[in-house]
Amino acid sequence: MRIPLDQAAESWRARAARFATEELIPWEVEAELNEGRLPPEVKARHKRLAIEHGFSAMDVPVEYGGRNARVVEQVAVWEQLGRVTNALCWCFSEPHRWMFEACTDEQLQRFVLPLMSGKRKECYAITESGSGSDVAIETTARRAPDGYRISGEKWYVTSANHADFFILQARLADGPHAGSHALFFIDGDQPGIELVRTPVFSHTFSDHHPIYRFNDVLVPESQRLGTEGDGMQYSHSWFRRERLMIAARCCGAASRLIEEATAFASTRMVGGEPLSERQMIQAMLADSVTELWAARLITYEAARAHDDGEDLRSLHARCSVAKLYASEAANRIADRVVQILGGRGYMRENAAERFFRELRVDRIWEGTSEIQRLIIARALLKRGLEGM
């Protein structure tokens, strides 16, 4: 069941498939049994190969040394990387196109381009204890003679334990744009940054999601992205892309789950015949394939719309449709596959058990399923079905 891809996109897909299958998947169980950790030399190899394959440069313009990959090519890559558990595919950072619109040359050289080469690692500090999908930011950026003073607490700062700088969203406390948002680069060693605690989550990742408190942290004006008030616009750009790539990863996870369930059901003997001969098992497999096929079509169609330069408001809704459907379908598929595998599906050494835990958060982060439904409904009511 393949989406027709042109030669360039197929080349990206095949490269990612080999990387996932040959380099990452063989290390999943060791990572699972060691709190997500792998030997340093293995992690270094994964990072080096990912960069050599161009994955860290996909969304970077050619003039900055990037690959300028189309969105459909990026979706093809992340679908294959989504077949891997334990977030082992998070072995590289990738700058996003909106950064090259927002950042000064100095910021690009200091913060953004080193992500592509692997010399630096970022983390996003957006969510707060009293805000999530609605991005009701309480962290403030108050004007100071030498820049801004940042104060507030950020939750779920993904990969902060591996990062050396934050991309933080704050509400402007004063000035002509008071009440609007801005984004800031903040080096991790800035005075006033406090690690509050590191919660333990259901998945087994080496990348943690800690809580940080920013205590009157001084940030120079030169580290603000874009102009005052642009923060939400750039966050929307990030959310659109991330939601689409989550959909792609969910499609990859669902594909692997179905393959494993099919292989198991075909060889597991029950009452003298393969489990796959049972019609209830066949129904579960059929439902899973149907949902996967629908999720892939939705996701690749949204990628095509991106590449064709369609209206941003329409794209925002389409990415929400893709994330909503693909993430919820992948969760249903994981549940069925655990059921098909029986007790084996509840063993951490099997991918089905790991996906069962890991996929759950895809219905929460980067906008909950409920928020995606609101975005979709509002787009429908404003622009009609043909305008979406």
Language-model segments: residues:
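N-terminal glycine-rich flavin-associated loop
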Residues: 88-106, 135
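Hydrophobic, small-residue-rich alpha-helical packing segments that form membrane-like cores
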Residues: 132-133, 148
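A short, charged helix-loop
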Residues: 212-237
